[in-house]
From Swiss-Prot:
Region entry Disordered, spans: 216-244
Position of sequence motif Nuclear localization signal: 202-208
Gene3D superfamilies assigned to the protein according to its UniProt record, in alphabetical order: Winged helix-like DNA-binding domain superfamily/Winged helix DNA-binding domain
Region (Hydrophobic repeat HR-A/B), start-end ranges: 173-218
Protein name: Heat stress transcription factor B-3
Family statement drawn from the similarity comment of this UniProt entry: Belongs to the HSF family. Class B subfamily.
Database matches in Pfam families: HSF_DNA-bind (PF00447)
InterPro entries with a match to the protein in the record: HSF_DNA-bd (IPR000232), WH-like_DNA-bd_sf (IPR036388), WH_DNA-bd_sf (IPR036390)
PTM note: Exhibits temperature-dependent phosphorylation.
Length: 244
């Protein structure tokens, strides 16, 4: 009996010793996962949102829980090429969707993700790209089955075509939003151009009036100088007789 008890105690000790490395390994794996860097797309996006020099185009919202693209046209034209080597705003929006961002409101381009916060850059490591849903594949050549196949042999619902239509609808919606934003931007530029033209016309008119006033005073001064010269030529007279 004592041998059996000692054997059980030995087994307990062994289990305790084995348990410690296991917990340690779990802890290490968690730490390693936490140290994984965020995707480059998120790093670049966070950087441009954080940059105070671009606040007129893109910046955090008032609470720091999301960011707003204030000027989509300028953002696509000036900033996107320096960040992602393209100028397609719709593509940028689709990328945000794949990382779980959502459009907060319909009145402006505001996007939010609970792991994308002002002053909490480390949270981005928890954001991962959504895995696209796999379509059915041909067993012989592993090519994608045409999307006209609506239902599989077991009667399950279609799995690929819905996702494809959602992507197309999202792309079309983003394109329409971009088109509307560009129209609004163009309208604002036209209004500003008309205002500047009006101000320029007023400035030219004032400048012309000023030049006319200067010319008039210059002419009066020349006339006064000529009269003074004539009086000096007449000399001094006494009872109408010129004194020598």
């Amino acid at each position: 009996m004592e041998d059996a008890g000692e054997h059980l105690r030995c087994n307990d000790n062994v289990n305790d010793e084995e348990r410690l490395p296991l917990e340690f390994m779990i802890g290490n794996s968690t730490s390693t996962a936490e140290l994984q860097p965020p995707p480059p797309f998120l790093v670049k996006t966070y950087k441009v949102v954080e940059d105070p020099t671009t606040d007129g185009v893109i910046s955090w919202n008032e609470y720091g829980t999301g960011f707003v693209v204030w000027q989509p046209a300028e953002f696509a034209r000036d900033l996107l090429p320096t960040l992602f080597k393209h100028c397609n705003f719709s593509s940028f929006v689709r990328q945000l969707n794949t990382y779980g961002f959502r459009k907060v409101t319909t009145i402006r381009w505001e996007f939010s993700n609970e792991m994308f916060r002002k002053g909490q850059r480390e949270l981005m490591s928890n954001i991962r790209r959504r895995k696209s849903q796999h379509w059915s594949h041909n067993k012989s050549n592993h090519q994608v089955v045409p999307t006209t196949t609506m239902v599989n042999q077991e009667g399950h619902q279609r799995i690929g075509i819905d996702h494809h239509h959602e992507d197309q609808q999202s792309s079309a919606t983003s394109s329409s939003f971009v088109y509307t934003a560009l129209l609004d931007e163009n309208k604002c530029l036209k209004n500003e151009n008309e205002l500047l033209s009006c101000e320029l016309g007023k400035t030219k008119k004032k400048c012309k009036q000023l030049m006319e006033l200067v010319e008039r005073y210059r002419g009066e001064d020349e006339d006064a100088t000529d009269e003074s010269d004539d009086e000096e030529d007449e000399g001094l007279k006494l009872f109408g007789v010129k004194l020598e």
